[in-house]
Amino acid sequence: MTATALQNSLYPSFGVINSFSIYEYKDTEYEEYALSVLRLANDNLSQSIAHFWKLPFTEKEINYHLLSKLEPLLKILQKITLEEEVSQEIQREALLFIDNALTYKDLLTDYFEERELLLSNSKRMITPILIKNLDDEIQTR
C-alpha cells in the first residue's frame, strides 16, 4: 500500500464522516460510500500487514509518517463509531480499520526501532576493525 493509495482511500471517507452528522448520511449513498472506503482501506492495510517484509524501505517510511499523522483522525473515527446512529456495519469496519492501522503502525515502529538498534550495533562492532585496519595501514607506510 502506498501512502498515496492510503490517503486517497482515507481522506475522502473522513471528509464524508466529518462533513455531515451521522444521522444525515445514514441510509444514504454517503453511508454506502463511507463503508466502501473503509473496506478498501482495510483491504489495503491487511495487504500491507500480510506482505510487510516485501514492502520497500521507502514505502514503510512513508506509511509510518502517514499513519502518525492519521492518529488524531483515528480517535475521531473511534468516537464516531460509539454514536448510536452509526450502522453496525460501519462500526465493525471502522473498528477493524482502527485495529489494522494501529497494528500496522506497531509493526512499522518495531521495524524502525530494530533497524536503528541493528545499525547502532553494527557501527560499534565495525569501529574497532576499522581502527585496526587504519593502524595497520599507517604502520606499513
Task: Give the location of each predicted region.
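Long, low-complexity or tandemly repetitive, helically biased scaffold regions used
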Residues: 6-138
